[in-house]
Design a protein with these regions (language model features):
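Post-transcriptional modification and biogenesis factors for structured RNAs
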Residues: 1-154
Length: 154
C-alpha cells in the first residue's frame, strides 16, 4: 500500500477527488493540518461522492504530529522545485507521496526533510506555476502503483 500525504490542503473539491482516488486504489490518505476547510464541507463531500467510507483517512493537527506518528514512512516530495522526474523514483510499499498546499506548495522546512534525490517533479511548461493538486496526486500515485504491479487492483 502507498500513502498519500497532503500537507495543509486548501481546496475541498481537490481533497474530495483525492479521497475518491485513494478509496479506489487502496492508498491511505494522511491530511496534515491545519486544513483550509472542515472535513464535512459540502464541496468536499460532493467531489468525494460516497467514497469517504471506503477510504482510509487519517488526520493530524500539524506536521510534527504526522512525523511523530509515522517516523519510519519514507517520503517522496512532489514539488515544482524537485529535480528528479517522477517516473525515475523507485517506489516501494509503505512509501508516502507528499504534496503541498495548492496556493504555495511545500514550505522549505518540510521539503528539506526529503533528500534532493527524493524530490520529484512532473514535467510541465517552464512558464507555468503548477499543476492541479488532485491531478498531480493521481499521476504520482498511479506511477507508484504501476511500479508495484497494481497489486490487489485487478
Amino acid at each position: 500500500m502507498l500513502n498519500v500525504v497532503l500537507y495543509q490542503p486548501e481546496i475541498p473539491p481537490n481533497t474530495g477527488n483525492i479521497i475518491r482516488l485513494c478509496a479506489n486504489t487502496r492508498a491511505r490518505l494522511h491530511l496534515v493540518g491545519p486544513l483550509g476547510f472542515v472535513l464535512d464541507d459540502a464541496r468536499l463531500k460532493r467531489a468525494g461522492l460516497d467514497y469517504r467510507d471506503m477510504a482510509e483517512v487519517r488526520q493530524y493537527e500539524h506536521w510534527n504530529a504526522f512525523t511523530g506518528q509515522n517516523p519510519n514512512m519514507p517520503l517522496w516530495a512532489f514539488s515544482t522545485r524537485g529535480s528528479v522526474p517522477y517516473h525515475e523514483a523507485g517506489f516501494r510499499k509503505g512509501d508516502g507521496l507528499l504534496f503541498g498546499p495548492e496556493s504555495r506548495g511545500l514550505p522549505d522546512d518540510v521539503l528539506g526533510e526529503c533528500p534532493a534525490a527524493r524530490r520529484l517533479r512532473l514535467p510541465m511548461r517552464q512558464d507555468s506555476r503548477s499543476l492541479n493538486l488532485s491531478n498531480t496526486v493521481a499521476v504520482g500515485l498511479y506511477e507508484g502503483l504501476r511500479q508495484l504491479g497494481f497489486e490487489n487492483l485487478y
